Amino acid sequence: QPLNRIVQYIRQQEYLIQGIFEKKLYQIPLNEVLYFETVDKKTFMYTQHKIFECKKTLSAIEQDLIRSNVVRISKTALLNISCLVCVKPYPNHRLLAELNNEENLIVSRKYIPILRDKIRSGYYE
């Protein structure tokens, strides 16, 4: 399992995602992405300091990153668990995910088992 974690970390370093910021196209390494979110039918990629627009849908990104540290946490969000600091109970049987930039995201109860399995499988830094 430690070897799987090393291989996964290397893959994340190499995987680039296209994002648009101020009408310019950028290639963002997956390890710099905190999470993806869909708002008003647009998909955004959040890094430590910038928000990029993605042309792909959340479902397409999820499929592309199926063997990475990225996991769906709600109908509208994907989380890079490498950036996860901790999770805390949240009302209505949900979780509050605290990220390394001190931002919090809500994990829907439907996706808690998926998040738990991804963490336990060793797909994280």
Language-model-detected regions and their locations in the chain:
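C-terminal structural segments of small proteins and small subunits
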Residues: 113-114
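Conserved binding/recognition cores within well-folded domains
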Residues: 2-100, 104-106
